[in-house]
Amino acid sequence: MTSESEPNTSLPFSPIQQTLPATPSRSTSQVSMVSAEALLSHSSPTKQLTPSHRSSLPSALPYNTLLNAPAGSPALRARASTASSSRAPSVLDDARVEHNDSETQVLEITPPMDNYELDGGSDHTSLPSDASSIKGKEKQRSNDRNEIETVGAGGEMALPSGDARKGLKELVRRSTTADKGYGGHDHRRLSEKLSQNENLQILITQSDKMSYSPRLYYVLTNAGKPVFCSHTRPSEDDVTNLMGVAQALISIFADDDDRLRYIIKGNHRVAFLLKAPLYLFCVSDWGEPEHVLRLQLEYIHLQILSVVSSTQLLRLFQRRSNADLSTLLEGTEPFLSNLIDCSQYDFSFLTSTLQPLRMAPALRDTSAAALMPPSKFKDLLYVLLIAGGHIVTVLRPRKHSIHPSDLHLLLNTIASSSALRTTETWLPICFPKFNPSGFVHAYISYVLEDVGLVFVSADREAFEDLRVWKDMVLEKLEQDKTLSRIQEAIPLHPYTISSVGCPGLRHFIYKSRQHVQITQPIWEAPYEDGSTNQKRLVTTYQKLHDAVHAKSGQASALKLVYISTEHEACLVWATKPFELYITVSPQLSKSAVVAAANNVAKWVLAEEGRIFLKDAPVF
């Protein structure tokens, strides 16, 4: 088990640092009778935790429907009351204003990418670093910095003695006597450096024994009341007892001004995210780095805040510390479940990026021109055109950037509700990275089955004006058959690895740091959707991401990491303009791996006008 005293770090690209209030103490008179095994061994799902009163979705919904919640539901009343209790401009009062040089302006016009090339050399030479050589003591310090030391949590469980709270804390206190391999596996780590600078090779020769069971996600209040459970078959009593154990563990560490981060037992890892008045935790046996689970928990928390703002949430628990939040969130379980499903394999969540629709740049520019708003809309924040679940283009005010995680929440909300795609909707929604304290309003209208317009405004009375403007935009999009051409581009968005034309290349993920966007081919054999091979490869990508971003407490981030197993070989190459993750056959030579990386980088450079949204207009 690992705990921390310093604050959590926020999502990548986010300037917000959320302060964690002190965790209230909790009586633990019975806590010495609770075993930590109950928390670690609860891996077999049995029954879904759902609110006691669930209303079915009406077949015909008015334009002001909230998600898939019925009219008059607690979630609808909560949003409506919060939105109506404050004037619309107040949403902007607390919002962050970004200057032109801000890193969070994700859709800026940027200079062309530099032509980086990886020198392959021979098989007997190491992969080169892009840094200059270091001599003497500096060279030795660099070598030392490249060693990744991973320590697992093992050892025997100690019985509690004396004070029950102290006993339970000692029961699950971390032991650092066991030497684990890279990423938390039990096999012996075999590593050799590929150069004397910032490159590292990790050879994993034993078979992967991970079972890759479905991850289990839980949300509870700081009073121990269940809020959400991801799997479908646990009994309500089992979930309540499990969350009581988790709340007791968290509370014990909080009494010492400490915070519980994660527990490791065998192949299982339990990661915690404390966002008072909510606690979130996840159980996984995939072997991923700890920050991956915490980031997924962060997204679950943000999705909850999109329905109940942080101000409303704190006010509710200040009035009643044992408030039942599940009633307020009634009808939103599909959005949390869909978010969890997407975050398992979608790398844009891990990298806090977007993957726009792949299309001709001229068609994208024509679409953006039709969406330029008139000057009379003073409180208009964002204008989006969505096709096939992907962004075609997005327009924003010059002084307000849009954070990728806020877009993820919006896209997930729309994708999770068929009502939002079939009915003209005026949706109150909180964008936590824009302003966690208030709501904005999104006008959503799908003009075709898979093509929708979204206008986000701070004015809660702007529905009729935006509705009239939508008709004007639609008329422009229908000129020159722009709308039909967008619809025709949807089935052309996915592409296969053969498009690159590189023998031995199985898969890749390319992140443009300049555009804060990614591109990747579809998952193909042997990495079909939901397969063990796909889960293993995704976990390997997560470990590579951890290495180049130093997310697990490494002394510094690496630039080039190569992992070879009996199944595949993977390479990550991090430069200033991009990050590239490639997967190749394990039989390929090092020079062939280097050549494949260069080929992918050149292919993306040639195709970036189609695969990236480069010229996002501002107004």
Curated annotation (Swiss-Prot):
Organism, as annotated: Cryptococcus neoformans var. neoformans serotype D (strain JEC21 / ATCC MYA-565)
Protein topology in the membrane: Peripheral membrane protein
Family that this chain belongs to: Belongs to the MON1/SAND family.
InterPro entries with a match to the protein in the record: FUZ/MON1/HPS1_longin_1, FUZ/MON1/HPS1_longin_2, FUZ/MON1/HPS1_longin_3, Mon1
Compartments it resides in: Endosome, Multivesicular body membrane; Prevacuolar compartment membrane; Vacuole membrane
GO CC annotation, single: Mon1-Ccz1 complex
Role of this protein: In complex with CCZ1, is required for multiple vacuole delivery pathways including the cytoplasm to vacuole transport (Cvt), autophagy, pexophagy and endocytosis. The MON1-CCZ1 complex acts at the fusion of vesicles with the vacuole, through its regulation of the SNARE complex during the coordinated priming and docking stages of fusion, and particularly at the stage of tethering/docking.
The name this protein goes by in its record: Vacuolar fusion protein MON1
Chief localization: membrane
Record's compositionally biased regions (Basic and acidic residues): 93-102, 135-145
Region (Disordered) location: 1-145
Stretches with biased composition (Low complexity): 73-90
